[in-house]
Amino acid sequence: MVIIFLTACSAHQKKILIYANSKIQVDESQKNITVEDGTTQVEKELNFSGSDPVVLVVNSPRGNYSIEAPEDGYWLANLGTDTVVGSLQHTGSIRQTRVTQEQLQVQLDSLNKLVKGANISEAAKNYFIIPGKIAKITSLTGAKIFGPYTPVPSAFDAGSVPEVYKFYDIGEVYDIIHKLTEMSKYKYEKESGKTEDDDDSVYTIHPTKK
C-alpha cells in the first residue's frame, strides 16, 4: 500500500511555460519570478511535482502579483506586455496546396473572433491570455507549445508528441489578418491545360474586379 501511494504521488506533474519581453530571473524554489522591461520575446519552462497548487510570485515593472496553477497539466503564464492567443494544431500527413476564397474567409472570421477573445473555450482548445495571467493549456505535459515569433519547423515530427499548440503575440495575428484580407481581394484562375483534380496546378492571380 505504501509503494502504491508513493507511486501515485510521484505521478503529479505541473509544467509552466513562461512568456516575457525580457530576461526572466527565477530563484531556487522556482516560485519567485522577476521580469524586466524589454522588447525581445523570452521563454522559460518550469517543472513541478507534487499535488499541491503552484503559486508564482511575480515582480515586474508593472507591479507585483501572483499567479496560480492549481492542478496538474501544462500551463502558460503570460508575463509579457501583450496578449497572446493560440490553439491546438491539427497536424497530418496531407498537405493542402490550395486555399479557396471560402476557406480564406473562414480563416479570417476565426482570427477576427480570436483577437477579440470571442468563442474562446476549453472545448475548442483555443486561448486568449492577457498580460499577467496564466491558463491551463492541456493535461498532457508531454505536449509541444510553439510560442510567438517561433514558427513550427517544417521538419518537426508531430507524431513524437501527443498534442501541438501554436501561440502568437496578438500583433502577429493582426499582421496575418491584414495579409489574408489582401489575399481575399484576389481571384484565382486555373492555368491553361490544368484540370480541377490536379493538386499541383498553378494559378494565375488577378485583382478582383469590383
Segments (PLM) and residue ranges:
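C-terminal motif of bacterial Sec signal peptides marking the signal peptidase cleavage site
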Residues: 5-8
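Short, solvent-exposed S/T- and G/P-enriched segments that are highly enriched in secreted/extracellular
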Residues: 31-48
